[in-house]
């Protein structure tokens, strides 16, 4: 087995590393840099990747693609895609399959393709350094990436000519690099604020075992959003001073974006900076220049709410892991945005301790991916990585209830089966609808996909045994199967990347689950009450058909009256009324039970009398002497 490289496929920058002996090493690219801008440009029928693409962005904004990681695995109608359309100079278009693609140089590209071009650059960088062909890689993704986004990332690797041995979560990779060859046992938090995404993971590290206890995050929050705030501020100030709106000028926007990013970085180490952009635009009076003094205090005011948005996922991750802030022994900072003093201050305030700054936030994820690659090709031993799935997975059951098969923060790989049945008599097929989320009703969660299991032999409802199995592999990709135990018929499906979950939807699912917990509980209780009542109606009608003639007309009338009342109550949404009528029918059913018992007792008594009353026949016989 050859070398397995580790790639941090970032929103803003990417990085590649490999195990060299017993240590992971970041590999410099052809430009002599340890990280490569995640930017692709198409100019004069040529494709540029990384720094060369970034350098020409100002003069070629419409054909320069950046931050495509925000689009990967997303549907064109996703609110986050719509938001992104107003932030980038290139065109985001709707693909035939409904996904969000990009358009450049009169061609349409999927985000997986654009990502593949970046991965190819990483692959070439590694091959130039190692002097051998590289075909296998471990690629990192945000911990909160959903199934569609993970598959799309894996597809990007395949397009780039790489066999993706493992998709690994970025905070987990960072923890691997942080805890590699350290013997101490610790509970740590990894706070990862990168160019486009935010993740937080809580891990326990002990004797080479890296166990993720919980994870949370926001897949549409990162440095790009900070840059946009600065950019909008510059547009506003310039408009106030000159009366000219730069927001419709692609060339000016690209220059402003670069200036915003540069100012943001400078203000991490200084309290004030000058933003000078000569000849930013022109009008009838001549050329216009932008010259603005920008302070750290102004920046912090602009982005304060963005920083605050990272704290709630931290709080939720701790809650899910069963920890308090003072249980965390180390907070590891990952991602370029964690260099910002205000971010470090917010982390310190929440966790009550100084964050650990002993790792390079731009490189630590790639180093961790390389270590995982070393584990997979046996270069590294004595390391066990236990990661988790970020959201609950389940199916829709009778009444629209979301029945969980795998809870969020379950260790992966994981496999879970549960037996379900049919809702109607002689039902020959069932539709399995797979959802992801935290709400009690399926419709409030995200539909990942659906499939049919057909050919179920005719049987009364509740009799067929349909085993539904969820299987999440080590990459976090979901496989679902349904099998009729009687006929052996089986249907399997891998949830396909046909849109995936948006960051807003994922975040909203958890928040809605908390804010609407009471409402969800009541709704679930109503559904369960109705299901129980419906089953009682069904069994009562069946019993009446079989034993109704054993009841007196008065007893039968009482049961039928209670049955009619419960049916009427089932038409309402009143759980207490349904419970009351269910109780009445249950009591009335006692009469049927008594009649059945009486009939059975009489039959047994009759059989016993028949045996006792049988006549004994005396037989005459002769005793014949032996001769």
Curated annotation (Swiss-Prot):
<protein>
    <recommendedName>
        <fullName>Chaperone protein DnaK</fullName>
    </recommendedName>
</protein>
<dbReference type="Pfam" id="PF00012">
    <property type="entry name" value="HSP70"/>
</dbReference>
<comment type="similarity">
    <text>Belongs to the heat shock protein 70 family.</text>
</comment>
<comment type="function">
    <text>Acts as a chaperone.</text>
</comment>
<dbReference type="InterPro" id="IPR018181">
    <property type="entry name" value="Heat_shock_70_CS"/>
</dbReference>
<dbReference type="InterPro" id="IPR029048">
    <property type="entry name" value="HSP70_C_sf"/>
</dbReference>
<feature type="modified residue" description="Phosphothreonine; by autocatalysis">
    <location>
        <position position="197"/>
    </location>
</feature>
<keyword id="KW-0143">Chaperone</keyword>
<dbReference type="InterPro" id="IPR029047">
    <property type="entry name" value="HSP70_peptide-bd_sf"/>
</dbReference>
<dbReference type="GO" id="GO:0005524">
    <property type="term" value="F:ATP binding"/>
</dbReference>
<keyword id="KW-0597">Phosphoprotein</keyword>
<dbReference type="GO" id="GO:0051082">
    <property type="term" value="F:unfolded protein binding"/>
</dbReference>
<keyword id="KW-0346">Stress response</keyword>
<dbReference type="InterPro" id="IPR043129">
    <property type="entry name" value="ATPase_NBD"/>
</dbReference>
<dbReference type="GO" id="GO:0140662">
    <property type="term" value="F:ATP-dependent protein folding chaperone"/>
</dbReference>
<keyword id="KW-0547">Nucleotide-binding</keyword>
<dbReference type="InterPro" id="IPR013126">
    <property type="entry name" value="Hsp_70_fam"/>
</dbReference>
<keyword id="KW-0067">ATP-binding</keyword>
<dbReference type="InterPro" id="IPR012725">
    <property type="entry name" value="Chaperone_DnaK"/>
</dbReference>
């Amino acid at each position: 087995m050859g070398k397995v490289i580790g790639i941090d496929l970032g929103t803003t920058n990417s990085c590649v590393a490999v195990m060299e002996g017993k240590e992971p090493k970041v590999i410099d690219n052809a430009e002599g840099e340890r990280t490569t801008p995640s930017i692709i440009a198409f100019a004069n029928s040529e494709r540029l990747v990384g720094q060369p693409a970034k350098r020409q962005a100002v003069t070629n904004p419409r054909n320069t693609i950046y931050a495509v990681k925000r689009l990967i695995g997303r549907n064109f109608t996703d609110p986050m895609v719509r938001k992104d359309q107003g932030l980038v100079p290139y065109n985001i278009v709707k693909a035939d399959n409904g996904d969000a693609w990009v358009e450049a140089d009169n061609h349409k590209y999927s985000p997986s393709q654009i990502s593949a071009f970046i991965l190819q650059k990483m692959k070439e960088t590694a091959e130039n350094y190692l002097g051998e062909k590289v075909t296998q890689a471990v690629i990192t993704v945000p911990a909160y990436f959903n199934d569609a986004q993970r598959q799309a990332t894996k597809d990007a690797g395949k397009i780039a000519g790489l066999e993706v041995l493992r998709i690994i979560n970025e905070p987990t990779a960072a923890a691997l690099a942080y805890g590699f060859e350290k013997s101490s046992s610790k509970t740590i938090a990894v706070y990862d604020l990168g160019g486009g995404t935010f993740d937080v993971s809580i891990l326990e590290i002990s004797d080479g075992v890296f166990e993720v206890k919980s994870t949370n995050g926001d897949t549409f929050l990162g440095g790009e959003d900070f840059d946009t705030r600065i950019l909008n501020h510059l547009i506003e100030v310039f408009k106030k001073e000159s009366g000219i709106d730069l927001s419709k000028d692609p060339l000016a926007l690209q220059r402003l974006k670069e200036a915003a990013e540069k100012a943001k970085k400078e203000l991490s180490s200084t309290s004030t900076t000058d933003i000078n952009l000569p000849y930013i635009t022109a009008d009838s009076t001549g050329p216009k220049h932008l010259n603005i003094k920008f302070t750290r205090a102004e920046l912090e005011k602009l982005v304060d709410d963005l920083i605050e948005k990272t704290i709630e996922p931290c709080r939720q991750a701790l809650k899910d892991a069963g920890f308090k802030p003072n249980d965390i022994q180390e907070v590891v900072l990952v991602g370029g945005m964690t260099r910002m003093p205000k971010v470090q201050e917010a982390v310190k305030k929440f966790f009550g301790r100084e964050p650990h700054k002993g790792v390079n936030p731009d490189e630590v994820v790639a180093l961790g991916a390389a270590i995982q690659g070393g584990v997979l090709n046996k270069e590294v031993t004595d390391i066990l990585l236990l990661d988790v799935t970020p959201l609950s997975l389940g199916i829709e059951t009778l009444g629209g209830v979301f029945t969980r098969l795998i809870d969020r923060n379950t260790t992966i790989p994981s496999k879970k089966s549960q037996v379900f049945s049919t809702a109607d008599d002689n039902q020959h097929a069932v539709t399995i609808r797979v959802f992801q989320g935290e709400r009690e009703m399926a419709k409030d969660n995200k539909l990942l996909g659906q499939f049919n299991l057909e050919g179920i032999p005719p049987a009364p409802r509740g009799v067929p045994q349909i085993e539904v199995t969820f299987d999440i592999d080590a990459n976090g990709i979901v496989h679902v199967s349904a099998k009729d135990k009687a006929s052996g018929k089986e249907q399997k499906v891998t949830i396909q990347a046909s849109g995936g979950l948006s960051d807003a939807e994922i975040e909203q699912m958890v928040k809605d689950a908390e804010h609407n917990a009471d409402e969800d509980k009541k709704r679930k209780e109503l559904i369960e009450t109705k299901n129980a009542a419906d089953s009682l109606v069904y069994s009562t009608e069946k019993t009446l058909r079989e034993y109704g003639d054993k009841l007196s007309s008065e007893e039968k009338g009482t049961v039928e009256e209670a049955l009619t009342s419960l049916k009427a109550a089932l038409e309402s949404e009143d759980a207490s009324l349904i419970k009351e009528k269910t109780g009445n029918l249950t009591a009335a059913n006692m009469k049927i039970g008594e009649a059945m018992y009486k009939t059975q007792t009489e039959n047994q008594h009759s059989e016993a009398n028949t045996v006792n009353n049988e006549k004994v026949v005396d037989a005459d016989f002769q005793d014949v002497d032996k001769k």
